[in-house]
Amino acid sequence: DSVASRGLGDVYKRQDALQGVDIPVFVKNPVNPDLELWMGAMERLNRAGVQRIAAIHRGFSSYEKSMYRNLPMWQIPIELHRRIPQLPIICDPSHMGGKRELIAPLCQQAMDLGFEGLIVESHCNPNAAWSDAKQQVLPAELDAILSKLVVRDEYTTTDDLQNLRAEIDQLDDQLMNLLSKRLRICREIGQYKKEHNLTVLQSNRYSEILDKRGKQGVQYGLSAESVANIFEEIHQESVRQQLKIINS
C-alpha cells in the first residue's frame, strides 16, 4: 500500500484500515517541503501497528522556475535519515525530474546519498503512455540506466578518511568560535541601537553584506545562493538576539 502526497493530512482512515495488517507501506513525501508532516504520517501508522514502513521521496512542489518537475531538496530526506536512521528511503526520479533525460543523473544522486532504492517509470511505448509520458523510459533504457549506476559503500572508512574528518571537526570548532564572537558583537550593536533608539533591521547594511559575501564566496568556489542561505540564517539569529536586547 502507499500513502500519497495529498493524503498525508488525513492518515487516520489509512491508519484504521491498516491496523493489524502485516504489509509494507510506502509513504510519499508531502507536496510542500514539510518534514514534520511527513514524519508525523509515518509515526501515526507505526503507532497503529504498521512495522514495515518506507519513505518515498518524489521531490517538492515550488513556484520557482526549475528544470525539475519537483525540486529534489535533498536536505529534507537527509534530515529524515538523520532522525530515523533505520527507515528505508526510496527515490522516485521519474516524478522528481518529470523528463526522461533527468532520470539517470537523479538516480545516481540518490545512490550517492545512500538511498535504499529507486522507483523508475518504464513503458514499452513511452510516448503513447496515458499519463506522465515525458518521464517514462523504455525497458532497454531503464536497463542501461541501472547498469551504469555506481552504488557506493556507506560505512567503510579508511585512515585517510578519518584524518580528513578530523580536520573538518577542527575547522567546525573554529567556525563555531568565530560565530560566537560575531554574535557577541551583534549583541553589542543591539545595545547601541537600543540606547540610540535605532531599528534592529538595517536593510542597506544587510544587502551590502549579502552582495559582498556572495561575490567573495564565488571566488572561493561556492555558489552565491549557498552563501546567501548561510548569511540569511546568521542574520536571522542576529536579529533575534538584538530584538531580545531592545525589548528587555
Question: Where are the predicted features?
Answer:
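Catalytic alpha/beta core domains of metabolic enzymes, predominantly
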Residues: D10-P126, W130-E141, T157
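P-loop/Walker A phosphate-binding loop and immediately adjacent motor/lid segment at beta-alpha junctions
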Residues: A17-D34, L146, V150, E188-I189, ...
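Extended, hydrophobic interaction surfaces within ordered domains
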Residues: G98-R152, V200-A228, E232-Q236, K244
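Domain-level signature for soluble enzymes in the chorismate/prephenate branch of the shikimate pathway
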Residues: E154-S248
